[in-house]
Amino acid sequence: MSGPVPSRARVYTDVNTHRPREYWDYESHVVEWGNQDDYQLVRKLGRGKYSEVFEAINITNNEKVVVKILKPVKKKKIKREIKILENLRGGPNIITLADIVKDPVSRTPALVFEHVNNTDFKQLYQTLTDYDIRFYMYEILKALDYCHSMGIMHRDVKPHNVMIDHEHRKLRLIDWGLAEFYHPGQEYNVRVASRYFKGPELLVDYQMYDYSLDMWSLGCMLASMIFRKEPFFHGHDNYDQLVRIAKVLGTEDLYDYIDKYNIELDPRFNDILGRHSRKRWERFVHSENQHLVSPEALDFLDKLLRYDHQSRLTAREAMEHPYFYTVVKDQARMGSSSMPGGSTPVSSANMMSGISSVPTPSPLGPLAGSPVIAAANPLGMPVPAAAGAQQ
């Protein structure tokens, strides 16, 4: 065996090669810390593997913010997330990093973000119309094309990491904790993304992946939305996950993919993969979801959910698909919020409309000796995991 065949991204291949080193060399990044006394925690929104997330108030201007208190991880990982958020700040539909502070007692870093009035996706997705799905998918694509054009892969695209304020039709791509800079020829860790959204490249341990990983994850989101099946590929572990995919896309194309890149398949797959034909997307349509499905939706989905990462649409190509013609037409007519890339302006006045008069929450006071770092549970009550708790 001569090892796997190398692969390079079809687009934005050399973005980081042409940037100064300080753009992507996050280990050398010097973090500028803000003042933690400016923030007062209000309530816990949820917890993720790497963080706890709180709603808070910036007491200098009474604006709502979200504070993500990072659990102890390698400094390198924290610096990577900060550098990526700073590089992407102001991009279309990218969550805005407002400040970085440190608790004086525990020395725990905390990231302060713009506040998004999110609706839990499990509730929201059940109510979305065909047009809504097209609209929000297009908004995610703006964020993905932007971060890819900036030489960055998100690597954790999933509903929990897409905040939607449905009332204002505002979307933000959050949780850049697994994001990484793309360097052609580099081999990356395959232990990224969440199981149901992991691309085949991760499941077969192919490390020279690229931005196209995010496009697979987006395809999984689209399938779950139009077919009303959450998640669409429901594996019980990482091995079963590939089996679930193979039962839909077929084993023949999987073996073609493995052969093309000279991938050595884990012997554990021998007993569980079996032989499966490729299924037509139409077989997932039924009376409850048919109003969300159209020929162009299925064509678009088919061009995302491909084993071969090089065969998937890029974010920019996806935005030009007929599935989005009505959305593009409407945004052009509305002048696209007068912003490049059609994003909602990220001025604090616009972000915080209607909440600038929120009174400072006096009952809580500074928590656990610090306005940022809370006691175990500041509200003294069970906190359900919020959508986006993985942030």
UniProtKB/Swiss-Prot annotation:
UniProt KW Amino-acid biosynthesis keyword: no
Broadest EC class assigned to this enzyme: transferase
Protein's UniProt keywords contain Transcription regulation: yes
Modified residues (Phosphoserine): S362, S370
Keyword annotations of the record: Apoptosis, ATP-binding, Biological rhythms, Cell cycle, Disease variant, Intellectual disability, Kinase, Nucleotide-binding, Nucleus, Phosphoprotein, Serine/threonine-protein kinase, Transcription, Transcription regulation, Transferase, Wnt signaling pathway
GO molecular function terms listed in the Swiss-Prot or TrEMBL record: ATP binding; Hsp90 protein binding; identical protein binding; kinase activity; protein serine kinase activity; protein serine/threonine kinase activity
Superkingdom of origin organism: Eukaryota
Catalytic residue list: D156 (proton acceptor)
Gene3D superfamilies: Phosphorylase Kinase, domain 1, Transferase(Phosphotransferase) domain 1
Subcellular location(s) per record: Nucleus
Tissue: Expressed in gastric carcinoma tissue and the expression gradually increases with the progression of the carcinoma (at protein level).
Reactions it catalyzes: L-seryl-[protein] + ATP = O-phospho-L-seryl-[protein] + ADP + H(+); L-threonyl-[protein] + ATP = O-phospho-L-threonyl-[protein] + ADP + H(+)
Residue stretches making up the Protein kinase domain: 39-324
PTM remark: Phosphorylated at Thr-344, Thr-360, Ser-362 and Ser-370 by CDK1 in prophase and metaphase and dephosphorylated during anaphase. Phosphorylation does not directly affect casein kinase 2 activity, but may contribute to its regulation by forming binding sites for interacting proteins and/or targeting it to different compartments.
Stated regulation of activity: Constitutively active protein kinase whose activity is not directly affected by phosphorylation. Seems to be regulated by level of expression and localization.
Pfam families with a match to the protein in the record: Pkinase
Subunit details: Heterotetramer composed of two catalytic subunits (alpha chain and/or alpha' chain) and two regulatory subunits (beta chains). The tetramer can exist as a combination of 2 alpha/2 beta, 2 alpha'/2 beta or 1 alpha/1 alpha'/2 beta subunits. Also part of a CK2-SPT16-SSRP1 complex composed of SSRP1, SUPT16H, CSNK2A1, CSNK2A2 and CSNK2B, which forms following UV irradiation. Interacts with RNPS1. Interacts with SNAI1. Interacts with PML (isoform PML-12). Interacts with CCAR2. Interacts with HIRIP3.
Miscellaneous remark of the record: Can use both ATP and GTP as phosphoryl donors. Phosphorylation by casein kinase 2 has been estimated to represent up to one quarter of the eukaryotic phosphoproteome. Casein kinase 2 has been found to be increased at protein level and up-regulated at the level of enzyme activity in the majority of cancers. However, elevated levels of casein kinase 2 are present in certain normal organs such as brain and testes.
Disease entry from the Swiss-Prot or TrEMBL record: Okur-Chung neurodevelopmental syndrome: An autosomal dominant neurodevelopmental disorder characterized by developmental delay, intellectual disability, behavioral problems, hypotonia, speech problems, microcephaly, pachygyria and variable dysmorphic features.
Role noted for this protein: Catalytic subunit of a constitutively active serine/threonine-protein kinase complex that phosphorylates a large number of substrates containing acidic residues C-terminal to the phosphorylated serine or threonine. Regulates numerous cellular processes, such as cell cycle progression, apoptosis and transcription, as well as viral infection. May act as a regulatory node which integrates and coordinates numerous signals leading to an appropriate cellular response.
Name used for this protein in its record: Casein kinase II subunit alpha
Annotated source species: Homo sapiens
Higher taxonomy: Eukaryota, Metazoa, Chordata, Craniata, Vertebrata
